[in-house]
Structures are given as structure tokens and as C-alpha cells.
């Protein structure tokens, strides 16, 4: 725990000495969770289904929980110095909103707010419902849980890049052969903690406040320059494109006042852009802030699309618009840019902005979707925001809770526009379980059948462009749950698990009548699927025996040439390793079929990085398995450039010669 965190907790403890609070929100408990999280970061282990999208986000959630506690007992919170004059309310009064608890809206129309008063009513309704249901402490310190994956996935992708694409500049490359970030959707760039252009490595240091630029044109690596961020700016990841670096993360403005009585609160997502034309002297050329904690982003056709979670923790006042309306730049979002929730209340927004790479000092467009907690999947043309209603305090029956709500926004050259909303039964494991193809949306969900019971099954749904269900298969793999999925053209594959690993193949050629083609049962389960060719599907997961006891990380190759008769043609178990970052972040995988290279980090008694190759006769062959130096919670990445392979963790970089993988250099930043 940092001195700054201790200082904040001390102030909270002083403020709460005479005020009873839930045990889970007690300062001592928050301190305990922080220390436990530090230990978790050191081990590198994130439990399945309950991981956080970033280590520093969990810490942010804990501090946010502490801040919520202060607000709850009446601490004085100063808002940003914004004039409500910038908000122009409609002359209409507040809309009439239904107040019957437990019912999700049946409307299939994605509606925008008519005025800020309407937005206020939805937010206040949530708080009223929260108060009346007496569940103020039910979220265990107010930490927001995220899906275990930290980016997205689904269409066939390659990790390698033989030429510059939307998120990688190649102008300086002495060899155009270098790897790129493993992405969810081909053609849609994603940020990461390490990038290369073939000549330089760009890496986020362990403190999340510096980016080092390392010359890799010779065997001996050399730091040529770096970027030091504002001390209150915690970077999460960045993009590299056309000699510009786009850094994304959270700007923290929390501090204890000198009078020891006032706690200042403020946090926003920041997009800061640097010009790399002079590689020895990067220059800041633009900054855009938006309300909320950074969630994720995408890059396509010269535009960044940035997503943040904006939670309404504080007491709000109807006419004090800056207290509850999101900001992008210095401007409050217009009412027409705020999409209303599907039920009668909400406690947060998912804020979406677009920023042009050529004008990085301002937002091109912005929207906000009111919700209770949503995840994001981005296809080539649309953004899908999905949230599982089971967590809702507003749904009091299983039918209302056990469904996923979907909202659809189109995007094109920076322009954002809401287009549809819908719902399906059950919940999505991650964004690999949702895929857009040929104007349809395919989903694989797990459905709970009884309140308080483990009884569940799995379903396949096909939705049209308006998010209306046009095809489905239900009651699959009873008492199991989806662990991974992948789609290729008219065929989908998904893995469920209880003690064995059934790999289902689904025919979507007739969207109104999807059909199960085959089911292969093998021990263990695959957490991540990646197409290795048109006929081969790679799986990375865990090896288990018939009793469900894990034996280590397993890699499998499936022959999918006949989707009705899928076969596991090769497998390799890496025993003594209980986890891989790939399970929660697909960007940790480097899969390049052209180079016959499969690389990913391992966690066990020691942290290692493994590279395997695949041959149809010999199966998997380990080409390299080396211990990883560095202990950054940001994770480990492997990249290649100019026939050299680099393993990066925090401030440590190790270089290997590809082919024999002999170590040729290392560098401590």
C-alpha cells in the first residue's frame, strides 16, 4: 500500500469513528483487500470468472469504495469547477417513468433522453431502489467486477503483421516482418502495453507512468528516449500509428486537503497523444479527457474509439448537471447523446468517444449509454454493449434477471449512432461468445434455471440487424457452462465444461435454423480458441482428470475440416503451471501460423514464457521455455521483429535469436 492510500484511509477512519458502516466497507477491511491484491499481483494468478480487467483497476475500485464510504457518511466532496450554464436543459418537464420494480422495459427501441431531468430521474430512481431494498453494503466494498477478459475476441485473426496496419507504424522498420497485437476483430486495432514497428520497442514500464522507447535494430538493445506522464496519470495501454503514440488510462485527482477535513474527488479517462517524428524527443500534441474509469478502446480508419465507465457515487442534485452528466473534453454530453436504460433506473454510464488521429486534441463524437454495468464487443462496423440483468437490484424474479441486454451503436469514420436494442436469455462468458456476421449476430449463452441453484444449460441465439431473435437452440450441455467460443464464417465452435470438455460445432448457414453439427468430449477445458488455419483450431486451457482435478496448462489442436466430426489431433500438457494470462487477456497470446509460432506466458512456481510449434506428424514441439524476469502486474508480452524474439515484463526485456532461441541480450529499463 502506498503512503497516499494510507493517508486517504486514515482520513476515512477518522471520519467514520462515530458512524456505523457495513463491515465490508470498514477501512481495515479495505486495507486488507489492498494488501491481498498486492499479493495476488505478485503471484500473477487471477481466478476464473472473478478477475479484474486490470490490476490497477482493482486498486482503483478499492479506493473508489473508500470514497463511496466517505460520501455515504456526509463527507464534503468538491466537484470539478464547472458551470451548469454549459448545460442547456429542454423546456420539457421530467418524463414519466414507470416505477414498478422487477420489470425490464419491453421496448425494442434505443431511446435518447429528452432532457437532463429525465436522466436525473433514472439515476435517482436507482438510488431510491437501493435504499428501499436495504442492499447498500451488498456489493462487498463497492468494487465493480469485470469479465475476466480484458479486451475482446471472435473473427479469425492473426497476431503477426507483414505490413503497417491501423495500429502499427512501419515507417522506420528495417524489416517489415514484425508482430502486432492479437486482436478480437480483424481490421480493428487494439491497444496494448507493448508495441513494435520493427525498429523500436515501445513498452509501458511497471509504474504505469513511463513509456520507454528502445532501439532494437541491432543485437544490442538501447534506450533512445522515453515518455514521462503526469504523476496523476496512470496509463493502461497505448496505440502506435503513423509516428504517433496514443496513451490511454486514468487521470486521478484524489487528494486530502491541507486542512485535513476535505477530501477532493475526481477521476477521468485520458487520451494523450505524442508525436514521434523525432524519436529522440517525443512531443505531446493533444489531450482529451472524458468522465469515468478507462474500460477499453479500438482503432479503425484513423479514429480511436474510447470507452469509460462513469459511476454515479455522489449525491446528485437535479439542476446541478455536472454532478451526474458525463463530460467529454470540457463539454457536458447533450441530452440527445445519452441513451436511456432498458429498465426504469441506472447507476452508471458507459461513455464512448471518438478521436481522430489527425486531430488528437478534441473529440470527434461522443455518446453515453446508461446501464448497471456493461461489457463491449466491437465488430467491423458496430459496437455492441451487453449487460447481464442478474446483477440488477431492479429485477425481482429469475425471468427478469436471467437475460443479457444488448445495445447496438454503429460507428464509421468517427461518427457514432445508436441503432437497436434487444435481449437474450442467459449470460455471455466473454466477447468471444458474441459475433457479428453477414448482418446477423450469433451468441452462445449460459442460462440459470432456478434461483439459488446450480442448475443451468446453454443456448445458441441468432439475432437480425434489429437485434430480434430469428433462430435459436436451447437446453444444451445441462449443468455445464460456456468456457470459450470462436466463430469462422458459417460455423461456430464453443466449449462447455463440468468435468470433461465438450467442443460443440454449430452450423449457422441458415440463420433461422442453426444446427449442432457435432460434439467432441475430451478431458479438461479450453479457455481460449484461435484459428490456426481453415482446418485447424488451437485451444489453450487446462488439463484435468475425470474427477476435474487440474494437471496443468494444456494446448490442443483440433481438426475442423469436417465440422460434424471434430477431432483432437494433438495435445501437450505443461504440468506444474496453473494459469496463463491468455485466460483473461487474449492479447497475451502470440499466434502466427505463417511462422509456425505459438507463444504465451505461464504461471506456476515460477513465471515462464513458452514458444511452441506445430507439425501434423510430430504434434506440438517446445521451441523455447524460459523464466520471465520482472514482476509487473501489467502482464508479460512476447513480440518478434527482424528474426529476434523479445519477452517483456514491466522494466525487463530479454532478446532471443529466432530459430534456436539462444538469448542474445537483456535490458533493465
Regions found by a protein language model. Name each.
Residues 9-11, 19-38, 78-669:
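Beta-sheet-rich non-transmembrane sensory/scaffold domains
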Residues 1-6, 10, 35-99:
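Membrane-interface helical sensory segment of bacterial ECF anti-sigma factor regulators
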Amino acid at each position: 500500500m502506498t503512503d497516499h492510500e494510507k493517508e486517504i484511509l486514515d482520513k476515512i477512519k477518522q471520519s467514520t469513528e462515530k458512524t456505523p458502516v457495513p463491515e465490508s466497507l470498514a477501512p481495515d477491511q479495505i486495507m486488507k483487500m489492498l494488501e491481498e491484491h498486492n499479493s495476488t499481483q505478485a503471484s500473477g494468478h487471477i481466478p476464473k470468472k472473478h478477475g479484474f480487467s486490470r490490476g490497477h483497476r482493482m486498486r482503483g475500485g478499492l479506493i473508489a469504495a473508500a470514497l463511496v464510504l466517505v460520501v455515504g457518511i456526509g463527507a464534503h466532496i468538491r466537484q470539478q469547477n464547472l458551470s451548469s450554464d454549459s448545460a442547456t436543459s429542454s423546456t420539457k418537464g421530467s418524463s414519466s417513468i414507470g416505477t414498478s420494480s422487477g420489470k425490464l422495459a419491453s421496448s425494442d427501441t434505443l431511446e435518447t433522453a429528452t432532457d437532463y431531468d429525465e436522466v436525473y430521474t433514472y439515476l435517482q430512481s436507482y438510488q431510491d431502489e437501493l435504499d428501499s431494498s436495504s442492499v447498500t453494503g451488498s456489493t462487498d466494498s463497492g468494487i465493480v467486477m469485470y469479465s475476466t477478459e480484458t479486451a475482446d475476441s471472435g473473427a479469425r485473426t492473426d497476431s503477426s503483421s507483414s505490413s503497417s496496419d491501423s495500429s502499427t507504424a512501419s515507417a522506420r522498420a528495417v524489416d517489415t516482418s514484425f508482430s502486432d497485437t492479437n486482436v478480437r476483430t480483424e481490421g480493428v486495432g487494439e491497444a496494448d502495453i507493448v508495441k513494435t514497428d520493427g525498429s523500436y520497442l515501445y513498452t509501458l514500464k511497471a509504474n504505469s507512468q513511463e513509456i520507454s522507447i528502445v532501439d532494437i535494430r541491432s543485437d544490442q538493445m538501447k534506450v533512445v528516449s522515453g515518455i514521462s506522464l503526469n504523476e496523476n496519470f496512470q496509463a493502461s495501454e497505448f496505440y502506435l500509428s503513423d509516428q504517433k503514440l496514443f496513451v490511454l488510462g486514468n487521470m486521478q485527482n484524489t487528494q486530502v486537503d491541507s486542512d485535513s477535513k476535505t477530501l477532493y474527488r475526481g477521476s477521468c479517462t485520458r487520451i494523450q497523444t505524442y508525436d514521434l517524428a523525432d524519436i529522440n524527443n517525443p512531443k505531446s500534441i493533444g489531450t482529451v479527457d472524458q468522465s469515468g474509469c478507462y474500460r477499453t478502446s479500438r482503432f479503425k480508419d484513423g479514429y480511436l474509439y474510447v470507452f469509460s465507465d462513469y459511476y454515479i457515487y455522489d449525491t446528485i442534485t437535479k439542476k446541478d448537471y455536472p454532478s451526474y452528466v458525463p463530460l467529454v473534453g470540457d463539454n457536458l454530453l447533450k441530452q440527445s447523446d445519452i441513451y436511456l436504460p432498458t429498465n426504469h433506473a441506472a447507476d452508471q454510464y458507459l461513455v464512448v468517444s471518438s478521436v481522430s488521429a489527425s486531430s488528437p486534441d478534441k473529440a470527434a463524437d461522443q455518446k453515453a449509454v446508461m446501464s448497471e454495468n456493461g461489457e463491449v464487443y466491437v465488430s467491423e462496423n458496430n459496437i455492441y454493449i451487453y449487460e447481464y440483468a442478474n446483477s440488477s437490484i431492479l429485477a425481482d424474479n429469475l425471468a427478469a434477471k436471467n437475460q443479457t441486454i444488448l445495445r447496438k451503436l454503429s460507428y464509421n469514420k468517427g461518427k457514432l449512432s445508436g441503432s437497436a436494442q434487444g435481449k437474450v436469455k442467459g449470460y455471455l462468458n466473454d466477447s468471444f461468445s458474441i459475433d457479428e456476421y453477414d448482418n446477423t449476430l450469433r451468441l452462445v449463452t449460459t442460462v440459470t434455471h432456478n434461483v439459488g441453484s446450480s442448475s443451468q444449460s446453454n443456448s445458441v441465439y441468432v439475432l437480425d440487424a434489429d437485434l430480434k431473435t430469428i433462430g435459436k437452440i436451447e437446453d444444451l450441455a445441462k449443468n455445464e457452462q460456456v468456457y470459450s467460443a470462436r466463430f469462422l464464417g458459417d460455423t461456430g465452435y464453443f466449449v462447455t465444461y463440468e468435468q470433461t470438455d465438450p467442443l460443440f460445432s454449430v452450423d449457422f448457414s441458415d440463420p433461422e435454423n442453426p444446427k449442432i453439427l457435432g460434439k467432441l468430449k475430451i478431458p479438461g477445458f479450453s479457455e481460449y480458441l484461435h484459428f490456426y488455419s481453415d482446418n485447424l483450431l488451437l485451444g489453450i486451457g487446462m488439463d484435468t482428470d475425470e474427477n476435474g482435478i487440474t494437471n496443468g496448462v494444456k494446448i490442443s489442436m483440433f481438426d475442423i475440416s469436417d465440422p460434424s466430426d471434430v477431432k483432437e489431433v494433438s495435445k501437450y500438457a505443461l504440468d506444474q503451471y496453473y494459469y496463463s494470462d491468455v485466460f483473461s487477456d487474449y492479447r497475451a497470446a502470440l499466434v502466427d501460423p505463417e511462422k509456425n509460432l505459438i507463444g504465451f506466458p505461464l504461471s506456476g512456481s515460477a513465471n515462464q514464457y513458452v514458444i511452441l510449434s506445430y507439425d501434423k506428424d510430430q504434434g506440438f514441439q517446445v521451441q523455447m521455455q524460459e523464466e520471465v524476469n520482472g514482476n509487473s502486474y501489467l502482464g508479460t508480452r512476447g513480440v518478434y521483429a527482424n528474426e529476434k524474439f523479445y519477452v517483456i515484463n514491466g522494466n525487463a526485456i530479454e532478446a532471443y535469436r529466432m530459430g534456436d532461441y539462444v538469448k542474445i541480450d537483456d535490458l533493465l529499463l
